[in-house]
Amino acid sequence: MPANERQAEAWNGPESAHFVAHADRYDRQLEPFTQALLERAGRGTNQVVLDVGCGSGATTLAAAASAERVVGVDLSQPLVELARRRARVARIANAEFVIADAQTHDFVAGTFDLLISQFGLMFFDDPVRAFTNIRHALTTDGRAAFVCWQGLHANEWLMLIADAVRRHAELPEFGGLIRGPGMFALCRPDEITTLLGAAGFDQVECDSYTPTILLGGGGNLDDSVDFLLGGGMPRGLLGFVDPSDRNDVVRIVQAELADRYEEGVGIRLRAAAWVVTAQA
């Protein structure tokens, strides 16, 4: 099977649909991570930046405010098309978007000063090959800065679903490179350091970042519940439950979220990621 074919199928189908439909809400929900990423990446007006797994373009367009040029790469055509529309509407001329698999894409060597990524580097079926390919696209003194999720247990916004599911079904252990591509593939800092070292990076640092996020960027209770349960990982967790029990799981989740709901604000939940930096 060609590299990342399963990921390409997913992100050009059901996985992308929810992100495209709710792009603005995802941007607001993830804003703390975007700010942390760009602060750690640093700002330089002469930088040429590569944004891998750029999705609908929020981080690419934000980076373009201070960079010479930013190229966003994603294998999802629907998300890249949305990112291009956003750039046109915002009249941001120094951002461009490419539909490509960063694991195998033929980057011009030494093109980019900086790699950034917001939750876009966990889905490679050959991570060493992917990070090596990306490193070759960086200049000899290039840098990398990205964010990736910590484990399921550290993310309240998903654990409340997992806890409800466990009342009816067993859940496997999630996370780690040994389990293949997925949301939690890079949840272990020791594995991140080893992986990046194998790909030729050094001076790797993994710093914990645990903000409170506003689920769906705010909204009423019903909308927030629907938004959460429509996402890829929540749907995956619900998939472990027999269909006859799913309504009960949803009721439990609704009750948990109702307890956390703030009128006029929305639902605040704890999240956890690693902010990773490295030298090419």
Please give the residue ranges for each predicted region.
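Conserved class I S-adenosyl-L-methionine
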Residues: 1-47, 58-62, 79-82, 86-90
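Conserved catalytic/acceptor-binding region of the Class I
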Residues: 26, 128, 143-217
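Core SAM-dependent methyltransferase catalytic element
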Residues: 199-202, 224, 273-280
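A short acidic, Gly/Pro-enriched loop at the edge of an enzyme's catalytic core
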Residues: 103-114
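Helix-to-beta-strand junctions that scaffold the AdoMet/dcAdoMet cofactor pocket
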Residues: 124-125, 138-140
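A short SAM/SAH-binding and catalytic strip from SAM-dependent methyltransferases
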Residues: 113-127, 150
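C-terminal helical/coil "lid" or tail adjacent to the Rossmann-like core of SAM-dependent
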Residues: 3-8, 15-22, 205-263
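Class I SAM-dependent methyltransferase SAM/SAH-binding core
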Residues: 48-105, 129
